[in-house]
């Protein structure tokens, strides 16, 4: 009986194929991992986690997780959509200092091409700020993020959010309300895609 169970497991593995998981074209189609499946359609909808460090070959950026979702399988390539990013908990903790203020915001924005994204920017001040200053900075963060999303398409907005250009834009303006030590886009999450958004084609 035990031999039959082992044989069935071996036969199951033999019937499965390996698939490369590929990042979207605007993330340079980097292969972020491999997986096995007996039926490639079962891969569609599966979330895959990687890091900016792996996507850019810069290990100093491993504190930023990137979430991809398989949208199609062509041959042995599973293509993906970018679904968001998040800073690691350890990294965020390392930024927090005593006698300073942390200012969080949570805002849903719509890009020029119709993607709805939840964005969570965070400011860290040099010293402890007053509640009125914190509120003013929070409102400015929300305004900047909304405006930038409305001006750009999904790919541009997400690249700016993940690679630091959006946080730099917030820093440049909000520092005049109260001195800031750092600004981060702590998390993004795709809430809705436009109905006409096509699945990414596999690389030739």
Curated annotation (Swiss-Prot):
Keywords, comma-separated and alphabetical: Ribonucleoprotein, Ribosomal protein
Pfam family, one: Ribosomal_S3Ae
InterPro entries the UniProt entry points to: Ribosomal_eS1, Ribosomal_eS1_arc, Ribosomal_eS1_CS
GO annotation (BP), single: translation
GO molecular function per UniProt: structural constituent of ribosome
Family label: Belongs to the eukaryotic ribosomal protein eS1 family.
NCBIfam families per UniProt: PRK04057.1 (NF003142)
Name of the protein this chain belongs to: Small ribosomal subunit protein eS1
Provenance organism: Methanosarcina mazei (strain ATCC BAA-159 / DSM 3647 / Goe1 / Go1 / JCM 11833 / OCM 88)
Lineage: Archaea, Methanobacteriati, Methanobacteriota, Stenosarchaea group, Methanomicrobia
